[in-house]
Design a protein with these regions (language model features):
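Long, distal/terminal scaffolding or interaction modules
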Residues: 1-205
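Ferredoxin-type iron-sulfur electron-transfer modules and their immediate structural context
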Residues: 190-267
């Protein structure tokens, strides 16, 4: 079912002998979860501690909104195959390892638009990909310490899922890549669009002459200053209290809309 192992506690071991549904390890707080098959969407969503081992592929939005309390070991997600779309969205901590073996999409093991909004954590991956959010994440060279950690824990992962024969497949360090979140100082800033460039490049292009409705309109489309007066004051505020009713109020089957009912209670 859904959310197996959710809010799992430390010293808890859950082993699923087959594929599983969505949200495996949701809000996991320390449990070790082994899935002998594919996992659905939302795997390791908001996980804070613990480990999840998946002997297959995972669906969309895996490892999203994770976090890491420095007092404890970081959460870990190990995937033998590939990740689905929007992987690592708003990831704020933890370690993910995508092995890319028999991936669902062999030429893109990280899925569509991964790591959007990523602010923490790191991801090891083995295989081709089609890009990621460069504004939020960056590739770095893997140091000896990272490789030693990956190599050691890779044996543990393969042992838990019963695929130790794949150790040689993943033993080539040059085939692995490491991606980490950018610091706030490293964030790639988007250029600010001026009002003039928006007016000429977007507004006039879509709504001006030759646009979607520009040829059908005869309205005054000149720029309106911040405080308008005289003829350019296109909207004049008037007081029309209780003149119009919302659809729910007008068609209320009881004849006493909610706001009037509470008004009667107050009175």
């Amino acid at each position: 079912g859904q959310r197996v192992g959710s809010m799992g506690f430390p010293n808890t071991n859950i082993e699923i002998l087959g594929p599983t549904s969505d949200d495996v390890g949701w809000l996991n707080a320390g449990a070790r979860i082994v899935v002998h098959g594919n996992a659905g969407n939302g795997t390791a969503n908001a996980m804070a501690q613990g480990k999840i081992y998946v002997a297959g592929n995972i669906g969309a939005r895996g490892m999203t909104m994770t976090k890491h309390n420095p007092r404890f070991d970081p959460p870990e997600l190990w995937v033998l195959g590939s990740a689905g779309d929007y992987f690592g969205e708003f990831m704020a901590g933890g370690i993910a390892v995508i092995c890319g073996f028999e991936a669902q999409v062999p030429d893109n093991i990280l899925g569509h638009r991964p790591f959007v909004g990523m602010v923490g954590g790191k991801v090891f991956f083995h295989g081709p990909y089609r890009g990621y959010s460069r504004r939020d994440a960056k590739l770095i060279s893997m140091g000896d310490e990272e490789w030693a950690w990956l190599n050691q824990n890779l044996h543990v992962f393969l042992d838990h899922i019963g695929r130790t024969e794949l150790v040689r497949v993943f033993s080539d360090r040059s085939q692995w890549q490491l991606l980490v979140a950018r610091t706030p100082q490293e964030k790639i800033q988007r250029p600010m669009k001026s009002i003039h460039s928006f007016h000429t490049g977007v507004w006039e292009k879509e709504l001006g002459r030759g646009g979607l409705i520009g040829d059908l309109m005869q309205l005054d489309r000149s720029p309106v200053p911040l405080i308008t007066t005289a003829q350019l004051r296109r909207y004049v505020p008037i007081w029309e209290n209780r003149k119009y009713a919302a659809p729910c109020e007008a068609t209320c089957p009881t004849g006493i809309p909610v706001q009037e009912r509470w008004q009667l209670v107050r009175e």
